[in-house]
Amino acid sequence: MNRYQALFQRLSAAQQGAFVPFVTIGDPNPEQSLAIMQTLIDAGADALELGMPFSDPLADGPTIQGANLRALAAKTTPDICFELIAQIRARNPETPIGLLMYANLVYARGIDDFYQRCQKAGVDSVLIADVPTNESQPFVAAAEKFGIQPIFIAPPTASDETLRAVAQLGKGYTYLLSRAGVTGAETKANMPVHALLERLQQFDAPPALLGFGISEPAQVKQAIEAGAAGAISGSAVVKIIETHLDNPAKQLTELANFTQAMKKATKI
């Protein structure tokens, strides 16, 4: 049983959904980033979704673009990212860790090499934002070879053909988009998602986590009531980091408070 399966089983037994925060590794700097990731887990995050800093994050709104720029300015390289992940993994043996990234970073040292490094660091899943299902074969093959779960996005406008491919190729969880467009807490999630969740279930897709525009506990509760296995929040988390750049201690306190409130909303 992989870590995602074990997590969803535990949460189901406890009548809870998953709360999964997203942060960019190395934002605002590698040392504080490590403290941030651990704080999120300690405050109740069920899993982590992590971005590797990239200079041209197409699917991201201004908040996460800012996080990428801060991490790159702090000299965060893929090597440093994997080192930080390995440290988080050593401290948290059961917490699923997912990467959400762009294909260029996977290609940089070869696809196999990338997934092998993921395996070594303790990564559970990889979602490549700019690779659709019909171009995913080399990535899926490498993921399977190294025991990594390939994650795919189910957009709200998806055809049955796309959803079938997402269900067949995806492992771990399905990233369910609450709306089209770029990431950002400024743009609210479009509920309801019942119909899309029902279609995913028909195709026997992995459990769905709802993302894009999730910034408050009521949305988490809504997502779980609609049938999602949980919710992912990125821009709202990164916004807290951005707001408290000059006060690292306050930054951690505010992140913990936000995570606790969001996690509380997952209790069915």
Swiss-Prot record:
The alpha subunit is responsible for the aldol cleavage of indoleglycerol phosphate to indole and glyceraldehyde 3-phosphate. This is Tryptophan synthase alpha chain. InterPro entries: Aldolase_TIM, RibuloseP-bd_barrel, Trp_synthase_alpha_AS, Trp_synthase_suA. It catalyses: (1S,2R)-1-C-(indol-3-yl)glycerol 3-phosphate + L-serine = D-glyceraldehyde 3-phosphate + L-tryptophan + H2O. The active site is at E49, D60. It comes from the Bacteria. One of its GO terms (biological process) is L-tryptophan biosynthetic process. Pathway: Amino-acid biosynthesis; L-tryptophan biosynthesis; L-tryptophan from chorismate: step 5/5. Coiled coil: none annotated. SUPFAM superfamilies: Ribulose-phoshate binding barrel. It comes from Vibrio cholerae serotype O1 (strain ATCC 39315 / El Tor Inaba N16961). The keyword Transmembrane does not apply. Keywords: Amino-acid biosynthesis, Aromatic amino acid biosynthesis, Lyase, Tryptophan biosynthesis. One of its GO terms (molecular function) is tryptophan synthase activity. Its EC number is 4.2.1.20. It is an enzyme of class 4 (lyase).
